[in-house]
Swiss-Prot record:
Alphabetical keyword list: Activator, DNA-binding, Nucleus, Repressor, Transcription, Transcription regulation
Pfam families recorded: CBFD_NFYB_HMF
InterPro entries linked to this entry: CBFA_NFYB_domain (IPR003958), Histone-fold (IPR009072), Ncb2 (IPR042225)
Subunit-structure text: Component of the Ada2a-containing (ATAC) complex composed of at least Ada2a, Atac1, Hcf, Ada3, Gcn5, Mocs2B, Charac-14, Atac3, Atac2, NC2beta and wds. Homodimer. Interacts with NC2-alpha/Drap1 to form the dNC2 complex.
PANTHER family reported for this sequence: PROTEIN DR1 (PTHR46138:SF1)
Residues annotated as domain Histone-fold: 19-82
Sequence similarity: Belongs to the NC2 beta/DR1 family.
Compositionally biased residues, Acidic residues: 173-183
Subcellular localization(s) per the UniProt record: Nucleus
Name assigned to this protein: Protein Dr1
Length: 183
């Protein structure tokens, strides 16, 4: 018989693939007992127990599957395995979870077929989408044009008009130099 301390040791590299992710186990522990600090040794024991439980259920479900000459283990095989191993309470909870999963899957299927049930061909939907994109581009160009025109108008307000109606330009430095020579 093996030493109980050896069973608590982390699994070897080859067994590491057969365990649940430690982060998942830690999250479950934290959710179930948020105010309790759980030692690493206890976490490792829980991880090993979970892995052993899954292995036990999987093996029994495989036997049920083989007895029925099936090649794929399905939910009914797992539920029967729970029953055969004496986990009647787990079976009832597993059935409830299975029912919920089936409802979610059916809802997902309904949502994915919603586009198909519109009755509009995909080509028409694509054409409508392209039209909407073109309208959005036109609207954006119009807004940018209006913004540009308002900036131009603001710049015109800052420059005073000349007598002939044209707008005075900012004097250049060369013009200033010419004026100094006249004195």
């Amino acid at each position: 018989m093996s030493n109980p301390q050896e069973e608590l040791l982390p699994p070897s590299a080859e067994d590491d693939e057969l365990t649940l992710p430690r982060a998942s186990i830690n999250k479950i522990i934290k959710e179930l007992v948020p105010t309790v600090r759980v030692a690493n040794e206890s976490r490792e024991l829980i991880l090993n127990c979970c892995s052993e439980f899954i292995h036990l259920i999987s093996s029994e479900a495989n036997e049920v599957c083989n007895m029925r000459n099936k090649k794929t283990i399905n939910a009914e095989h797992v539920l029967e395995a729970l029953e055969r191993l004496g986990f009647h309470d787990y079976k009832q909870e597993a059935e409830a979870v299975l029912h919920d999963c089936k409802e979610v899957a059916a809802k997902r299927r309904r949502q994915s077929t919603r586009l198909e049930n519109l009755g509009i061909p995909e080509e028409e939907l694509l054409r409508q989408q392209q039209e909407l994109f073109a309208k959005a581009r036109e609207e954006q160009a119009r807004e940018e044009q209006q913004q540009w025109m308002s900036m131009q108008a603001a710049a015109m307000v800052q420059r005073p008009p000349l007598a002939d109606g044209s707008v005075a330009s900012k004097p250049s430095e060369d013009d200033d130099d010419d004026d100094d020579d006249d004195y």
